[in-house]
């Protein structure tokens, strides 16, 4: 697996853990679902925090690069879970964000 693919997969898993951890409380607060959903939400957010520690860069650089992948994963969530069709602007924005992530994550190491 190339370095970019490994980093992208780790970022995608991190983003999914964060989105699930935030979506479940949203279901409780906005959708009237059981408060028991807060338990897996907390576990998902703990997983998110742990996954962030697996990234090889300094925390600030990791968060900056992670933002690009988060945008793409959130748009996939929008399409798959929320059932909202993506626009060309959504796709273009995600492509730009992923390009920025690649520049930050794959910069030459001194």
Curated annotation (Swiss-Prot):
One of its GO terms (cellular component) is plasma membrane. It comes from the Bacteria. It is a multi-pass membrane protein. The chain crosses the membrane at residues 9-29, 34-54, 66-86, 88-108. Keywords: Cell inner membrane, Cell membrane, Membrane, Transmembrane, Transmembrane helix. It is found in: Cell inner membrane. Its main location: membrane. Belongs to the UPF0060 family. PANTHER family: UPF0060 MEMBRANE PROTEIN YNFA. This is UPF0060 membrane protein Bcenmc03_1254. The lineage of its organism: Bacteria, Pseudomonadati, Pseudomonadota, Betaproteobacteria, Burkholderiales.
């Amino acid at each position: 697996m190339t370095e970019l693919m490994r980093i992208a997969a780790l970022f995608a898993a991190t983003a999914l853990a964060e989105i699930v951890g935030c979506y479940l409380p949203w279901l409780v607060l906005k959708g009237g679902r059981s408060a028991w959903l807060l338990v897996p939400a907390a576990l998902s957010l703990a997983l998110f925090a742990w996954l962030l520690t697996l990234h090889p860069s300094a925390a600030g650089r990791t968060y900056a690069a992670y933002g690009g992948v988060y945008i793409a994963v959130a748009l996939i969530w929008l399409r798959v879970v929320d059932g909202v069709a993506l626009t060309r602007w959504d796709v273009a924005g995600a492509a730009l964000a992923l390009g920025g992530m690649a520049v930050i994550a794959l910069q030459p190491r001194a």
